[in-house]
Amino acid sequence: NANADTDRAAQPFKTTAEKTGIHILSVVSGGMRCFTCKGHEIRVPADANGLTFRVMDSPIYIKMVEALSANAVPMAGSEMYVAMQNGVVDGHENTIPNILQDKTYEVQNWICMDEHIPSTSAVYSNEAL
């Protein structure tokens, strides 16, 4: 990632290493997050109005869904499939790799490829390694 190669992007990594001894070796892409839904096609933001989405228990994800005039239900990922299967929530937002891994496509029939948030992971190491 070209952005991660700049001094400005590297500074938080250096600060973390200095304060904690934990070195961030790499940041990798986990894909872009998209909305899925059962029985409701989402093409424009207004299509999400009144729907209920499972989200991670994170204020930014909750506010994002609420900004669509939809309802956010913070829920563990392990509960997501059954919640969608039983109609507790209309859908969720996740990356394509996670949608495939969790097989949520079995209980969802629409995906909105809006790519609203990039999902990243980091590789860490302590100084001993």
What do the PLM-derived regions correspond to, one by one?
Residues 4:
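Cys/His-rich zinc-coordinating modules
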